[in-house]
Amino acid sequence: MATVMKKVDAVIVGFGWVGAIMAKELTEAGLNVVALERGPMRDTYPDGSYPQVIDELTYNIRRKLFQDLSKSTVTIRHNSSQTAVPYRQLAAFLPGTGVGGAGLHWSGVHFRVDPIELRMRSHYEERYGKNFIPKDMTIQDFGVTYDELEPFFDKAEKVFGTSGTAWTIKEQKVAQKGGNRFAPDRSDDFPLPAQKNTYSAQLFEKAALEVGYHPYNLPSANTSDSYTNPYGAQMGPCNFCGFCSGYAC
């Protein structure tokens, strides 16, 4: 017989980053919330403790933090004439499992969505004509604009402790070395300065500048200094261990 639980205001299925943030926002708004997560409980300690976390066998080979694709996966096809087949080999798309989801093993690359990406269909039709996009391609414009989302991008960067270098703030150029001149305008600076460049990054920057390109510091949700976010979570600075994507950090 099924167990009848106490009624709540909201049930969140999946307690990754999105689910966790939704639960916090709803709880602070006064709702009684329950979150359901099929994966294991994970926490900063011991799951993300250093140096235990730099274990290539556990994380890179045995894929501890990723979903078991033999049990649950998505299907993929390249066009409507093909038969969709299950995604069975992890590549660039790395779905996480357990509390924290993919946020636990995310490398921290933290670009904002470009305004063009939010109106992708219109952009390409304006540029290349109505017949450019195949009929069976589902590409669509989003129902919101960059300006509508910008305050939430700003809040997210403050929650994640994003490190970076701004190019413009409120349409005023604040260009410093390392700023991205191609980035959309922002209402506030990054909460933390950009990460220090490694030696290889310095060599790349030098070579790119010499041939006329515009290299910039990568926005990174790995804190460049000690940081306490608006939720009260304390974060230590990145220690440049190099074990990023796929490892608990």
Region roles according to the model:
Residues A2-F132, T138-K155:
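N-terminal glycine-rich phosphate/pyrophosphate-binding loop and immediately adjacent elements
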Residues N60-I61, D68-T73, V85-A92, E117, ...:
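Conserved redox-cofactor binding core of oxidoreductases
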